[in-house]
Amino acid sequence: MSAFWHKIGCCVVAKPPPKKKRRRIDRSMIGEPTNFVHLTHIGSGEMADGMQPSGPIKEQMRSKVPHANGRNSLL
């Protein structure tokens, strides 16, 4: 009978540790925007249609976005 329990024991895996709860962010943790510049307005309709900004709007936005790894990080 001990051989039976030995075989069963090798298949049982330990439970992974419980995941840490993510802290909820509330208004008191968020400060005022710094260096904010309103470039243009894109309505929810354009975003829902999946349209990409084009022409002057795209160039204006591209000139303001910080670059990461030599590429534009947002556009």
UniProtKB/Swiss-Prot annotation:
Cytoplasm listed as a keyword: yes
Record-linked PROSITE patterns: CRIB (PS50108)
GO cellular component: cytoplasm; cytoskeleton; plasma membrane
Lipoprotein among keywords: yes
GO term, biological process aspect, one: midbrain-hindbrain boundary morphogenesis
Gene3D superfamilies attached to this UniProt entry: CRIB domain
Gene Ontology molecular function: small GTPase binding
Pfam family, one: PBD
Positions of S-palmitoyl cysteine lipidation: 10-11
Family annotation (InterPro entries): CRIB_dom, CRIB_dom_sf, SPEC
Source organism superkingdom: Eukaryota
Membrane disposition: Lipid-anchor
Domain annotation CRIB: ranges: 30-43
Function according to Swiss-Prot or TrEMBL: Probably involved in the organization of the actin cytoskeleton by acting downstream of CDC42, inducing actin filament assembly.
Protein name stated in the entry: CDC42 small effector protein 1
Primary gene name: cdc42se1
